[in-house]
Amino acid sequence: MLKKQMVLLISLLLLAFSSTAAAANWQWVASDENVGVFFDTESLRFGKIDKLGIDKNIVYVWWYMALDDAFSQKQPYNGEIVKKIVRYDKLNLNEQTITGLEVILRDTDGFILGQKNNTGTEHIAPDSRAALMYSAVKEYARIHAEEITERSIK
């Protein structure tokens, strides 16, 4: 009996670790009562210059905003509840601009409700969620520049 309990305990621990390992590259940026902001550290790439060079002032990143239940119900999309807004953006660290390359709206089950490409370039507004993400990505890119450079060259 004790052997079965130990096997069950070990199985549960392995399951718990394997389910969190996939999310390990999503770094928390900030949260308020309505939205949590995260970015994918593994997705960071610097912009390319020619074939061999990179521009460390241009950073590509996947990030998302997870919406609270009450907040998401106030802002439906085509009658559906949006739980997550996932974005792929190009950040210009010199000009403090963000270029939306892809925006994906997901429901509570993770299904895509809507998708839009090339949403344009805009300046990052102070005190916005994009500004929080921008600052976190900029700092992460500064600290991990060598790792991101290697990933960007591949």
Question: How does the language model describe each region?
Answer:
Residues 9-16:
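Bacterial N-terminal signal peptides
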